């Protein structure tokens, strides 16, 4: 190491990395398997061939659930400063937070009615 | 060894029994298999699907035909290479797998041509890019058509054909479904491939007591034991469909070992399954069938689970002497059908224990474990038309639960016809 000096070490690492990359590439070529035949590649659903591509635009219904979760997540954020002043402010803070949660809860009930929580 | 098994006509139970051997691993997809085991005769209508199944097994692969009484040449048309074995199936399959893996036995070439139904190549030097990705025909295949979603959006409706060798469905059942996401929006059931001339008239010697009871007196004890075993075999399969395969294996072992009058293990099994909430959640309220829809269909346990006391045995004097009364449930959902079959298995074992040497009088029709069986058709043929209406609007998982709970056996009808035909020829 000392003989090579810092530049020599860097060069050695560089050469070794290139050799390793070549080795990996060549071994991959040597081991290459023949391509799968079409029937071997086609998806299995019981023996019949697919007629359309599997790319399928479907409704990701969990995103509305994710939005509802986000709303309640933010509510928790509001609760931290509220908890700090709650003892000082007393009953009035309790009522205010109650109103806030009630409004959010109405939103949840509305989402429920709109079948947001049905997974499929 | 990993085996993909296809049960042809009259071989359902023998194929199921292979699970009992510790060396056998019956896999759910040909991708995981080394050996394609075909039991019995397969109708010509399914030959192409079978060939496609064969070709999707990775190399090295081997096809093994287990005739089980089917005449030679019943199926071999499109299969130039195969090994026929008669008995000691697990041992022979192990030997074949060892030969395949050590290279002593060559892997089978594909049957279908290596031609892509939708060839596609992009504009780039490596076949990438071009209009294929965004032009509505990705990689040469058209995309699914649009359909209305319940939110008022227009999204893809994916056409999907499931079967005839989908492992959760009875062999031969082909569903042409259209899926919007996870929901089945349109379902059509193809004709029963087993009700064709290509499998009729097979040598059906050694068939079950229910088929024999169509034409000759059979002892009640034998019939009821067979009924209890058939119900337990269904439970074993249905548990495997619920991904409770280990419990299913225990039930299968029970089904093969249970004896008349010995209903205690079945009762405790019913209790355990009743407690199993995972099973309850996936079956309660799923696949509900109204009694009116089942009126006159002779759907056996399915009808009785919906509250119809529909049982041919109630008209038989020998059964009435034993104090037989049909068990019925009220709910008519998949959970009720589970309970119904377990309760009937218990009842059948008790009846079998008390039956003595009573025998049936052949009347040309019999109450089989799946319902009214007669040469003109089995219960599966009468239940198939109900399926599209039942499954539409369901999630895919619920649809599988429902289909499994109906216990269809597409091959039974042709077997009954074959039995009557065989009797006519013999006399």
State what each model feature region is.
Chain B
Residues 1-118, 345:
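Iron-sulfur-associated redox domains of electron-transfer enzymes in respiratory
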Residues 86-93, 97-427:
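Metal/cofactor-centered catalytic core regions of large enzymes
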């Amino acid at each position: 190491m000392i003989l090579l000096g810092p530049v020599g070490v860097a060069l050695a690492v560089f050469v070794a990395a290139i050799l390793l990359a070549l080795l990996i590439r060549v071994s991959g070529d040597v081991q290459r398997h023949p391509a799968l035949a079409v029937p071997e590649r086609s998806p299995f659903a019981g023996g019949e061939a697919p007629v359309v591509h599997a790319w399928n635009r479907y409704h990701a219904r969990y995103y509305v659930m994710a939005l509802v979760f986000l709303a309640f997540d933010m509510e928790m954020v509001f609760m931290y400063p509220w908890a700090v002043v709650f003892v000082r402010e007393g009953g009035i803070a309790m009522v205010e937070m109650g109103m806030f949660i009630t409004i959010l809860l109405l939103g949840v009930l509305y989402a429920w009615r709109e079948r947001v929580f049905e997974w499929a | 060894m990993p085996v993909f098994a296809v049960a042809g006509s009259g071989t359902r139970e023998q194929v199921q029994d292979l699970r009992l051997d510790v060396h056998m691993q019956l896999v759910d997809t040909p991708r995981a298999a080394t050996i394609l085991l075909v039991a019995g005769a397969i109708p010509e209508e399914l030959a192409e699907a079978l060939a496609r199944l064969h070709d999707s097994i990775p190399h090295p692969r081997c096809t093994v035909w287990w005739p089980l009484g089917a005449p030679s040449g019943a199926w071999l048309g499109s299969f130039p290479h195969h090994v026929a074995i008669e008995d000691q199936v697990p041992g022979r399959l192990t030997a074949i797998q060892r030969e395949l893996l050590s290279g002593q036995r060559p892997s089978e070439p594909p049957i279908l041509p290596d031609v892509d139904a939708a060839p596609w190549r992009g504009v780039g030097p490596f076949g990438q890019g071009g209009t294929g990705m965004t032009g509505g025909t990705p990689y040469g295949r058209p995309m699914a058509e649009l359909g209305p979603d319940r939110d008022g959006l227009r999204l893809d409706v994916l056409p999907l054909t499931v079967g005839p060798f989908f492992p959760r469905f009875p062999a031969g059942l082909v569903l042409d479904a259209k899926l919007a996401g996870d929901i089945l929006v349109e379902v059509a059931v193809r004709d029963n491939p087993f009700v064709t001339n290509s499998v009729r008239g097979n040598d059906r010697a050694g068939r079950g007591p229910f088929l024999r009871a169509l034409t000759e007196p059979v002892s009640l004890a034998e019939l009821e034991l067979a009924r209890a075993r058939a119900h337990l075999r269904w439970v074993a399969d249905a548990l495997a469909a619920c991904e409770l395969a280990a419990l299913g294996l225990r039930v299968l072992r029970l089904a093969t070992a249970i004896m008349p009058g010995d209903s205690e293990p079945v009762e405790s099994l019913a209790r355990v399954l009743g407690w199993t909430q995972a099973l309850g959640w996936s079956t309660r309220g799923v696949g509900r069938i109204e009694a009116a829809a089942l009126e006159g269909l002779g759907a056996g346990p399915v009808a009785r689970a919906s509250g119809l006391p529909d049982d041919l045995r109630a008209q038989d004097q020998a059964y009435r002497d034993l104090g037989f009364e049909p068990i019925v449930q009220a709910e008519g959902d998949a959970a009720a059908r589970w309970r119904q079959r377990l309760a009937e298995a218990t009842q059948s074992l008790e009846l079998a224990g008390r039956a003595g040497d009573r025998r049936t009088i052949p009347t040309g029709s019999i109450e089989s474990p799946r319902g009214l069986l007669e040469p003109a058709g089995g219960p599966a043929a009468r239940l198939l038309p109900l399926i599209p209406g039942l499954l539409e609007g369901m999630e895919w998982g619920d649809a599988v639960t429902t289909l499994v709970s109906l216990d269809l056996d597409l091959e039974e009808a042709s077997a009954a016809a074959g039995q009557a035909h065989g009797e006519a020829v013999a006399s």
